[in-house]
Curated annotation (Swiss-Prot):
Site feature (Cleavage) residues: 60-61, 75-76, 99-100
Signal peptide: none
GO cellular component: cytosol; membrane; mitochondrial outer membrane; mitochondrion
Modified residues (Phosphotyrosine): 54
Residues that bear Phosphoserine: 78
Native species: Homo sapiens
N-acetylmethionine PTM positions: 1
InterPro entries: Bcl-2-like_sf, Bcl2_BH3_motif_CS, BID
Lineage: Eukaryota, Metazoa, Chordata, Craniata, Vertebrata
UniProt-recorded name of the protein: BH3-interacting domain death agonist
Length: 195
């Protein structure tokens, strides 16, 4: 049973990160990648399965009870709202940081992501290197994890704006980077909201 909980937790973390990155990109005023973003939105898994109308007849003739599942769905809906609100807030924070990202850094990252022979690990390293460069130049008036998260999301936005065809690649690279490096912070945000 513990294994199932752990696997579900990882899948849930991935869905939360997907929703966070997607919500951030949706909150951006830049429409140059809107079509690609809409297409990506149709491919993303939902946070929780939809149990609406799921009423199965059991072998004993009774209807199955999904009160627990209904509660999970309701919790997930409120969780989705919380994550979307966090994404909107991070996009607002990102707007104030947007101009601090050098176009040359975005161009270089876009070129690296465009190279299809590079592994996902290489892409994560490329994103990490770009973030390290930005973090060195950025003032420390915000906690490091929040700064890293906002800058990673901003880099995804900037690359997608620069080259809309890279949206899917930069989205998945950003989700993987966040899940590998900022998972605990994102879990905390999802649990506590934006404090």
């Amino acid at each position: 049973m513990d294994c199932e909980v752990n696997n579900g937790s990882s899948l849930r973390d991935e869905c939360i990160t997907n929703l966070l990155v997607f919500g951030f990109l949706q909150s951006c005023s830049d429409n140059s990648f809107r079509r690609e973003l809409d297409a990506l939105g149709h491919e993303l898994p939902v946070l929780a399965p939809q149990w609406e109308g799921y009423d199965e007849l059991q072998t004993d003739g009774n209807r199955s009870s999904h009160s627990r599942l209904g509660r999970i769905e309701a919790d997930s809906e409120s969780q989705e709202d919380i994550i979307r609100n966090i994404a909107r807030h991070l996009a607002q924070v990102g707007d104030s940081m947007d101009r601090s990202i050098p176009p040359g850094l975005v161009n270089g990252l876009a070129l690296q992501l465009r190279n299809t022979s590079r592994s996902e690990e290489d892409r994560n390293r490329d994103l990490a290197t770009a973030l390290e460069q930005l973090l060195q130049a950025y003032p420390r008036d915000m906690e490091k994890e929040k700064t890293m998260l906002v800058l990673a999301l901003l880099l995804a936005k900037k690359v997608a704006s620069h080259t809309p065809s890279l949206l899917r690649d930069v989205f998945h690279t950003t989700v993987n980077f966040i899940n590998q490096n900022l998972r605990t912070y994102v879990r905390s945000l999802a649990r506590n909201g934006m404090d």
